[in-house]
Amino acid sequence: IAIVSTGLIFHDSAERQHLLGLKYGTIILDDAHRARRRGGLGARRDEPNNLLNFMLQIGPRARNLLLGTATPIQTQVSELWDLLRILNEGREFVLGRTIFNPRWGDWQQALPAVKGDYNPADEREAWEWLKNPLPPGAEGGPFPALRLHLDLPDDRFYSDRGYGSLGYAAQSALDQAREPGFLRQHN
């Protein structure tokens, strides 16, 4: 067990580098809202600050990760997505495999869906939203049928299959995802 001051993390210290070389059972970050983009003015305003950068690197080195904050959004909605990115690193069931499908990882694109202000235009687009990350079958809705059709266990959270490769039953199940508020309820 180690209790480490975030002051060591904010400054690029030798201790910080040492911590990045270890593996962890559980990491708990208090005041997680401090892990965010630099902000302010200038070309570097959208870059991660040292704490966010550290957490993005160390997240995959831990089995469990807990972020504590009373105020996940200090000034910008993007700060909430920064915290979600930390939780997603090495896991891919929070925001999905963002390199292959950036919809949930892009706060500007995902926010209208999360708020219920956006619904997919058709089943093909619904599949693009749902396939990565694909919720477990226990979530109900179309997910049990989709997982059964794709032969995906609940511990795999994405499908790389295109809409055209889905059978009729799976494509029909996606109609539920076009209902108002579906993405808000299942995100």
Regions found by a protein language model. Give the residues of each.
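Short, hydrophobic, well-ordered secondary-structure elements
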Residues: 74, 81-84, 185
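Inter-lobe coupling linker of SF2 helicases/translocases
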Residues: 2-24, 41-63, 67-70, 91-187
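A short, flexible beta-alpha/helix-coil linker loop
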Residues: 9, 34-35
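A short helix-turn-beta junction within AAA+ P-loop NTPase domains corresponding to the substrate/partner-engaging
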Residues: 80-94
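Catalytic P-loop NTPase motifs of RecA-like helicase/translocase cores
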Residues: 35-38, 42-44, 74-76
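Walker B catalytic acidic pair
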Residues: 30-31
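Conserved catalytic segment of ABC-fold P-loop ATPases
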Residues: 63, 78-79
